[in-house]
Amino acid sequence: MSLKRNIRRLDSIVPTAGREGSDIQFNLYKGRGVAVFTSGGDSQGMNGAVHSVVRMGIYLGCKVCFINEGYQGMVDGGDNIVEASWNSGSDIIQKGGTIIGSARCTDLRQREGRMKAAYNLIEKGITNLVVIGGDGSLIGANQFRKDWPGLVKELVDTKKITPEAAKSYPNIQIVGLVGSIDNDFCGTDMTIGTDSALQRIIESIDAVVATAQSHQRAFVVEVMGRHCGYLALVAALACEADFCFIPEWPPPVNWREILCKKLQEMRAEGQRLNIIVVAEDDDRDGTPISSDLVKDVVAKTLKYDTRVTVLGHVQRGGSPSAFDRLLGCRMGAEAVLALMEMNEESEPCVISIMVTRWYVPLMQCVERTKAVQKAMSEKDWELAVKLRGRSFQRNLETYKLLTKLRTVEKDNLSGGQNFNVAVMNVGAPAGGMNAAVRSFVRMAIVPSLYSLRYEDSFEGLANGAFKKFQWGDVTNWVMHGGSFLGTQKQLPNEKNVPLIAEQLRKHNIQALLLVGGFEAYHSTLILSKNREKYPEFCIPLCVIPCTISNNVPGTSISLGSDTAINEICTMIDKIKQSATGTKRRVFIIETMGGYCGYLATLSALASGADNAYIFEEKFTVEISLRRGSHRCKMAQGVQRYLIVRNEYANKNFTTEFVKQLFAEEGKGEFSTRINILGHAQQGGSPTPFDRNMGTKLAARALEYIITQIKESMVNGVVSTKSPERATLLGLTGRRVVFTPVEELAAETDFDKRLPCDQWWLKLRPLLRILAKHTSIYHTEAMEDTEDYD
């Protein structure tokens, strides 16, 4: 029987399913019009959405317009509403802010202002709007839509437009993209800009940690978020903060005593610094808890050298993260398609996306968002946390557990029993490995489990290189890349399997967690199949996929892949800058990934590359050159051409061969250069996404392992031969799923080390469209209502 356990979010907003797999033809909506504008506060990733709206709209045959300066530009009209060309979307995806400007507009709140806006849109022939902004911008758009028929009638009555024009524009259609660093809008997993803001926060805190350790200081870091504590909470998890203040879960009245006691305990454990994260506008019973107040409490009570760092608008700035670039691109494309398919009865919707995308009713999301604010104003904190969603709840629960210092006598998971659980890294190092190990260790210590580590993978295990973990052993592990345990690619084999079994028996290991890549998955499969011969392997085994290649079956995303894509995008941005100076140059960039083209495809899409050569999609010399798009780009626009090639895309068409091909083709017209990015792609400091995913997956893995240990216990001995006790913990869609590795074996190409089914291949048509290749595009829709947490 297949084992796929997951946690369902029963109270989630139910979306309307789209048309996954349907074909969208070139020039399908020729003659239609679309306008895009950004409103309210800016956020990183908005330009990616603008880039995608322009190019998808033009691909579909639409006339696409920019409305500069947000709603104010719509009211003022004139040169603020301009037609966009294909090149309008060039070289903007890596830029922060919004190239078309944004402004807060009071005129639109008045009927006279809305009348002017309606007139200007009719004059330009625009009735389809893509709104990129926060909840205020989206609510304003919905009100504008409701008033539209009356506004048009009044324009006819005052003879500002003709009755014929009124008949041509009887209604207006609106699709919203939520652009906000706060991530405070219900109905979408992540808003555009949130991931980038988290990266700015973590970069700042990581920098602060160095000086804090040097001087044994305490730092109070104030972050943005308005009335939402998402940024503060997730940042606290990602930087191992000692304390966190968020508006959804304010501390008790005696928070001063609790805070100081916690900081003293951490110093007593040998920690040289303390980090406290404070969300702006955090309050308890109407009394604000400011960063300065927290600083004064610590400094006066504990006499610690305490400093305040207010990050401010730094959080909005800088280049967007790869996640936000991809988010903007995919949302923008889907927004145009949604507009084209709307009719008079269609209500405004919001494009929501995580691994899949779907449409959710705008006002349903707005009402849910208002319900959170109402719960907080009524001091119903439990309801406020619940309404934020299961992901927010899980973040809060994990934070509470990981910041506990003292072991509780009895835990509801272990039932007060002591179990021996071990953890090891297998495969190549990747961002998030250390975060996963830290989380597993500390979550194990809380219920009084004995947590052991095996160093240097199976080589170390066979040689007995183990150590029992203590709480302080994993302090500050989250912020570091690589693997502190040491990791090797060696698989269990005939020589070392007996030694591995002996060590597991010697240390009475009752469960084993492997954090690593394809090798970790394959190793677990080998151990599982050797259970008949070695009873020491008849224990719960679990794998957390952690590899930059994202080539492990049973999961959509592997730990470390987000860090790698961000590193690749950063390097490509610098290469593009070089090309901007030299002009008329083709760059061929080689990425890692083995035979898996995930890194090449997603980094190409996130960096605005023109093509990506991968093993999964065959290419030839004729295909590479016949489009002639590289010649067109040299003659106009940015005058460069960028190709991302996966390292094993084709054994004959190597990176050097492709370079020589383009060099010969471009004699006298353009030059060609190659860049092999190498091991720099494994990244330095892990991204917040990888840190927190590793933290939460390891916590979930431990919960599941403890349950399996108790279910497999017979007369005090753990023994199980069930395939369902050797699992891989992965993300499929929006679900966290434990899948037996023996079941996954049927879905694996072991020769090429690839899953047989890879979701991201559906992004290939979008990559080609945005790079000006005529292609068929496949829309995606959510298949379920379950939530990754």
Swiss-Prot record:
Q: In which residues is Mg(2+) bound?
A: 135
What's a Gene Ontology MF term here? ATP binding
Region Interdomain linker, annotated ranges? 405-419
Cofactor(s), names only, from the UniProt record: Mg(2+)
Q: Which organism is it from?
A: Haemonchus contortus (Barber pole worm)
A Pfam family cross-referenced in the UniProt record is: PFK
This chain's protein is named ATP-dependent 6-phosphofructokinase
User: Would the keyword Secreted turn up in this protein's UniProt record?
Assistant: no
Family statement drawn from the similarity comment of this UniProt entry: Belongs to the phosphofructokinase type A (PFKA) family. ATP-dependent PFK group I subfamily. Eukaryotic two domain clade 'E' sub-subfamily.
